[in-house]
Design a protein with these regions (language model features):
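Conserved nucleotide-sugar phosphate-binding/catalytic loop shared by glycosyltransferases and other
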Residues: 10-64
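Short, polar loop motifs at secondary-structure junctions
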Residues: 23-28, 90-97, 144-146, 211-221
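Alpha-helix C-terminal capping/helix-to-coil transition sites in glycosyltransferase folds
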Residues: 84-86, 133-134, 181, 242-243
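A nucleotide-sugar donor-handling region in carbohydrate enzymes
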Residues: 109, 115-191, 216-217
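Nucleotide-sugar donor-binding patch of glycosyltransferase catalytic domains
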Residues: 231, 261-309
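A donor-sugar binding/catalytic signature common to diverse glycosyltransferases
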Residues: 236-279
Length: 316
């Protein structure tokens, strides 16, 4: 959502009239960020993950049906909406069914190649490519030159013109002094998010290190060393990421773009079973020397090593 909102802000600054279509779980974010814009809360939840682990072939088949069902809902709503509304541009943030043949349609995504075993992903990738080819343009929020932030995920065989527009982040680097504290950025669905928060806080408290928790959680241990902030807007998160000496977070692509922008290493802990996060965490560990840890095997040693290492990061 944060990368999409960055492009929305750019469109508004250029003098364009913008309307937003989103799902219910995105409504609060967009209404807070853009209170004066028309917002259509009509789209399906876009949070479908390709999971690793046992029964992979069955899971992949199920995901193909889920993807296609979502894309059909997006396409049908848009087609009906355009019967009584006119637009010059349709800009889709990672929604592969949100396009129309009569309106110039642009897709914003870093994921043009699905992560995971190529042979098993042959059919899902063919389905994805078919939808990619229905857009007029693709914008990739990454650098054009190597090393890319998205690794192999942004490689494509699509016929559509793809342009690397650079990372999109609302969090900019500043020269504020850092505080000795660990910022834990929470994301993802419950109950996994609260279990993740509880494990991280417990391990950090064993080292006597101050911790700030950004994001909602139901089971954070109480301590004078723990500061719970709940939901943070982009301005608050910008300040926290710049001033915190250390950061622990998931390896979602939007978060990685923000880390690249502020030039700070974080301890990356991908959500267990989510191929894309696992793929990105491994790539950033190998390419950029970021520390990583397994969600199911978090240990004090992971934090000792990270807290004693430099957090300065330069892409090259």
């Amino acid at each position: 959502m944060t990368r999409g909102s960055e492009r929305i802000s750019q469109f508004i600054q250029e003098g364009n009239t913008v309307e937003i279509a989103c799902s219910e779980n995105q409504e609060s974010f967009f209404k807070t960020k853009f209170p004066s814009l028309i917002i259509h809360v009509t789209l399906p939840n876009n949070h479908i993950q390709i999971e690793s682990g046992k029964g992979l072939f069955f899971k992949l088949g199920l995901r193909v049906f889920e993807f296609r069902a979502n894309w059909k809902k997006e396409k049908n709503w848009l087609s009906k909406h355009l019967e009584s509304n006119t637009y010059d541009l349709i800009y889709s943030d990672n929604r592969y069914g949100f396009y129309h043949p009569n309106v110039h349609s642009v897709l914003l995504t870093h994921q043009l190649t699905l992560p995971g075993p190529k042979l098993l992903l042959l059919l899902p990738q063919m389905v994805l490519n078919k939808n990619l080819n229905r857009f007029n343009e693709i914008e990739i929020p990454d650098f054009n030159e190597e090393p890319k932030l998205s690794g192999n995920l942004s490689r494509t065989t699509s016929r559509v013109t793809a342009t690397f527009i650079g990372p999109l982040s609302q969090i900019k680097k500043n020269q504020s002094s850092t505080k000795k504290q660990l910022l834990l950025i929470l994301s993802g669905p419950e109950p996994q998010r609260s279990r993740f928060a509880k494990d991280i806080v417990e391990e950090t408290l064993q080292l006597g290190f101050p911790i700030v928790v950004a994001g909602e959680s139901k089971s954070i241990p109480k301590s004078e060393l723990v500061k719970e902030l709940g939901y943070c807007n982009s301005a608050e998160l910008k300040k926290l990421m710049n001033e915190s000496s250390h950061i622990v977070c998931r390896s979602g692509y939007s978060t990685l773009m923000e880390l690249a922008t502020i030039g700070k290493k974080a301890l990356l802990i991908p959500t267990s079973g989510q191929f894309e996060q696992e793929c990105l965490a491994k790539y950033w560990e190998e390419q950029f020397n970021f520390p990583t840890a397994n969600e199911n095997e978090i240990s004090t040693k992971d934090f000792v090593n990270y807290l004693n290492d430099s957090t300065h990061f330069e892409r090259r």
